[in-house]
Amino acid sequence: MAAASGLIPTRVLLVVEEKAQLELLQVFSGRGDAAHSHLLEVHLGQEAQLNHGVLACADGVASLFAQCAVEQEPRSTYTFTSVVQGWSLGRIEPRVIQVDGQASTTLKGLAVADAEQQLAVHTSVCFEGPDGELDQLQKCLAAGRSHTIFNGAINVPVSYTHLRAHET
């Protein structure tokens, strides 16, 4: 999606049924004074798989807020990969809830900022059942007077054991 100026809002609801597999690539392109606000809501059925990519590039002036809200049923797999570059102000926010456990989540991202750009990646993964897995790797490159922020929250109730969470 690209525009010269103004607000560009989108909201998508995606239901991936039991045992289904899907690959999704979202591309956000920002030019001029455009303000992007995007929400993707996903429900993954049991044993469903979603490979989700976000490529967000801008000219240094536009702003971006992109949120992914994902619910995972048992034995589902969600893989999220993002590359964000060139936004004056940008925020990517994947939020995942493993509803009854036994799900696998992979979050990987790269944020590239220059000049006075400010980019933030805020992730949240909530384990609401046992035997969940998380693999997370977030990287950033910042030059000039730019800033990049990563904030990763993992919510694990004390009663659940056998969780594997790796965050870098």
Question: Residue spans of the language-model regions?
Answer:
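Conserved beta-strand/loop scaffold segments within soluble protein domains that form the structured core
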Residues: 1-167
